[in-house]
């Protein structure tokens, strides 16, 4: 994914946030070298819990409705917007912690991965709050897809597969 950055990300500090269900992991890389690694307890399941509480769904119903984009009309204003703000602030705090605990004072790119990374407005809000160019990681970028692959679904879910693709690629990269 870093290879898709300008100049293939050479000499760039890349902050990779993998937003999981319960944990968000920050990894800062430069030229494929891991410089920093920290986890924080904040993830996509908090959004599902908010949906569940607000609308009276079970957790499982809330998750299914979230994935199917089958939520009440006020969802974006009442739940999604404030959640995107909170998640963006958590990302900003994690970066500030990185800056205060290392000699670095900036990153060149913020890359978002994990199922929650595709939330509408998240990339833009992170850029706005941090001042750093943000993007959603897509491990399938530039890859030729077979005819049986449902491209729209794959593109939508691509950030969720970043770790799996990285692990699979390790076998082929010397």
Question: What do the PLM-derived regions correspond to, one by one?
Answer:
Residues 1-174:
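Hydrophobic/aromatic-enriched cytosolic interaction surfaces used to assemble or bind macromolecules
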